[in-house]
Design a protein with these regions (language model features):
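Short beta-strand segments
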Residues: 47-49, 77, 106
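Short coil/turn connectors at secondary-structure junctions
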Residues: 13-14, 40-42, 70-73, 100, ...
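Long, charged alpha-helical interface segments
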Residues: 86-163
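A generic short-segment signal for beta-strand/edge and adjacent turn/coil regions
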Residues: 14, 43-45, 70-76, 116-119, ...
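A glycine-rich helix N-cap at a beta->alpha junction
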Residues: 16, 21, 72-75, 102-104, ...
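Acidic/Gly/His-enriched mid-domain segments of enzyme catalytic cores or analogous surface patches
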Residues: 1-70
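Charge-rich, low-complexity amphipathic helices
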Residues: 31-32, 39, 58, 76, ...
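Class I SAM-dependent methyltransferase SAM-binding "motif I" and its flanking Rossmann-like core
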Residues: 55, 65-98, 103
Length: 163
């Protein structure tokens, strides 16, 4: 953040500004994420998190898990991707409202149990999706007006993307 932009926000009271020592155990995004939870946010969206260091990006994916544990919808969004851990184990995606063309699913634990994908080009019916599944659920496409996703256990990371 340039000094000019920081001064603009400070002088115009656009948002509360908190400054931290750069020598700390948490990333700036971790601190912002925790603050959003403490303030009672009903939804959290992180912008600009995918274009730089992968270690920071993976840390932010862990932040999504923290929000999921508290049943708070949280998203990582850039111009080509919307990444989330859905808080419900059964949900719909309307084709006209989806972000991009592709939908991918990844287990964040050992497995996602009994995943069912309906309305997709590559459907699944009560399939066990292990974390060793590779590309099984990558770049699927919605082929019906509404796609349905359900599963019975595990933590499911969903990526909606476009070229």
């Amino acid at each position: 953040l340039s000094p000019e932009i920081l001064n603009y926000y400070k002088e115009n009271h656009v948002a509360p500004i908190r400054e931290f020592n750069p020598m700390k155990d948490n990333t700036d995004t971790d601190i912002a994420f925790q603050q959003a939870i403490v303030l009672g946010s009903s939804e959290i969206t992180i912008l600009g998190a995918t274009g730089g260091r992968l270690d920071h990006f993976l840390s932010i994916v862990q932040n999504l898990k923290t929000a999921w544990e508290k049943k708070i919808p949280a998203y990582i969004v850039d111009s080509r991707n919307l990444i989330t851990i859905p808080v419900e184990t059964s949900f719909e995606i309307r084709k006209e409202e989806q972000f991009g063309k592709y939908v991918s699913f990844f287990p964040l634990e050992k497995e996602v149990a009994s995943i069912t994908l309906e309305g997709f080009a590559y459907p699944l019916d009560h399939h066990c999706l292990p974390n060793t599944s590779g590309g099984l659920c990558v770049s699927n496409e919605i082929v019906e007006e509404t796609a349905h996703v359900s599963y019975e256990g595990g933590i499911l990371l969903m990526v909606q993307s476009r070229d």
